[in-house]
Curated annotation (Swiss-Prot):
GO biological process: peptide biosynthetic process
Pathway: Protein biosynthesis; polypeptide chain elongation
Subcellular location: Cytoplasm
InterPro entries the UniProt entry points to: Elong-fact-P_C, NA-bd_OB-fold, Rib_uL2_dom2, Transl_elong_fac_P/YeiP, Transl_elong_KOW-like, Transl_elong_P/YeiP_cen, Transl_elong_P/YeiP_CS, Transl_elongation_fac_P
Official protein name in the record: Elongation factor P
Keyword annotations from UniProtKB, A to Z: Cytoplasm, Elongation factor, Protein biosynthesis
UniProt similarity note: Belongs to the elongation factor P family.
Coiled coil: none
MF GO annotations: translation elongation factor activity
One GO CC term, this protein: cytoplasm
Principal location: cytoplasm
Function: Involved in peptide bond synthesis. Stimulates efficient translation and peptide-bond synthesis on native or reconstituted 70S ribosomes in vitro. Probably functions indirectly by altering the affinity of the ribosome for aminoacyl-tRNA, thus increasing their reactivity as acceptors for peptidyl transferase.
Amino acid sequence: MISVNDFRTGLTISVDNALWQVLDFQHVKPGKGAAFVRSKLRNIRTGSVQEKTFRAGEKVEKAHIENRRMQYLYASGEAHVFMDNGTYEQIELGEKQIERELKFLKENMEVAIMTYQGEVLGVELPNTVELQVTETEPGIKGDTASNVTKPATLETGLVVQVPIFINEGEMLIINTGEGKYVSRA
């Protein structure tokens, strides 16, 4: 058990038989009445975000999420196969479980698989990934107003806005949290 006064961003808790990750929190001490903690939580299984208020000093159960380093091997129909580099154990995850992460996954990529009491919860991607541009319009010389962007399709099918000087075949660094272009690789 952990006190809500000890909340930190990224902490995983179990409330009402659901696993939640603390996205944001604020300790509030009103002039009249008891102090409380206002928090923004993300359900780990469904991805939904909810605001929840706790009384100051209230106890919640801390969920111990285990992260296992694994390598993405390949897709087989709707299943996606990952391998533990230490034990060579392979697990399959369905497309629905990793729908958002699929836009960033390449074969042989190292990721962290999140598990809770033996149940696979999902994939934790690195902060940035390198992906190749497979399709984009050519930049037109002289078309240089400030911050001009164009859509580019990457090798995983992800479409991002990139500066006009980016061409097909180039490797880009993409932020996985926002799904946006960072720089050339």
